[in-house]
Design a protein with these regions (language model features):
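Cell-envelope and extracellular/periplasmic
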Residues: 1-262
Length: 262
């Protein structure tokens, strides 16, 4: 029987973890950290994502970087969990469980995130599953990275604050009013090319973290994209590279510490 400290990780592709390339220090998995995954298929049909969750049980597996086509892909929740454990916050007899609910390319504007929408409903289902596992389980943090999809849709930013605020208010009403919520800026390599529309959504998120209480915002302007880290042959400018994801997780943890130490 495990007693889990549960970390929610939700949003789109930078929360899913799409960064690759060289790193200063290789990530070493902890025997105390696990993922909660859902099996799904994601297809693009007429320019829109079609997400289908398999009717199979959720899976708990060791938390580690994914290998795709012989390349390691980072995930900022891993270094967040690493720092959480190093700081002595994981008490004896407890484990970390990361609820992996992010899917690339998703947004509020296309009715995937938000109260009653498919991804948020699946997130709630996964959260309930995690909390109801045998043992003493508790949610310790909600890590969010999203907004790129809503930045590129004309006028979508006008509803972004209300939809994100309502979603997080609903989550806290269900599971705890003081659950720390942490979000972050986009990859600057991509954001700088579409600055006006991106900054509107980023500033909304930044402001919301100041208003909602027990929340933090992580700045990322110095973090490299896959394109910047891996050379001109790589054109992926929207995703944090693997090294940046390692750093990002530590910054999320610093924001978390600032919240819990107030």
């Amino acid at each position: 029987m495990a007693n889990y400290d549960i970390i929610i990780q939700a949003g789109q592709s930078n929360a899913e973890g799409c960064g690759y390339g060289p790193v200063t220090k290789e990530f070493v998995p902890s025997p105390n950290a696990f993922y909660l995954n859902s099996e799904k298929t994601v297809d693009v049909i007429e320019g829109l994502l079609k997400i289908e969750y398999a009717d199979v049980p959720f899976e708990i597996v060791p938390a580690e970087e994914r290998t795709i086509n012989d390349m390691l892909y980072g995930d900022f929740s891993l270094t967040f969990a690493e720092e959480y454990e190093k700081a002595g916050l994981l008490k004896e007899g407890r484990k970390i469980l990361m609820v992996r609910a992010a899917i690339g390319g998703t947004g509020f504007c296309v009715k995937q995130w938000g109260i009653g929408m498919q991804l948020y409903e699946k997130l709630l289902e996964m959260t309930e599953y995690a909390l109801n596992l045998d043992g003493d389980n508790r949610i310790v943090a909600f890590l969010w990275h999203q907004g790129e999809r809503d930045s590129v849709e004309e006028e979508a930013y006008k509803n972004y604050k209300a939809l994100l605020s309502e979603q997080m208010s609903d989550f806290r009403a269900r599971y705890g009013a003081e659950i720390p919520f942490i979000a972050a800026d986009f990859v600057n390599d991509w954001k700088s090319k579409y600055f006006e529309q991106c900054e509107r959504v980023v500033q909304i998120t930044r402001d919301l973290t100041k208003e909602m209480g027990n929340a933090g915002f992580v700045e990322t302007s110095d973090l490299k994209s896959n394109h910047q880290q891996n050379g001109e042959e790589c054109t992926d400018d929207i995703h944090f590279c693997r090294e940046s994801l390692h750093i990002l997780g530590r910054r999320y943890f610093k924001a978390f510490q600032d919240i819990i130490n107030k």
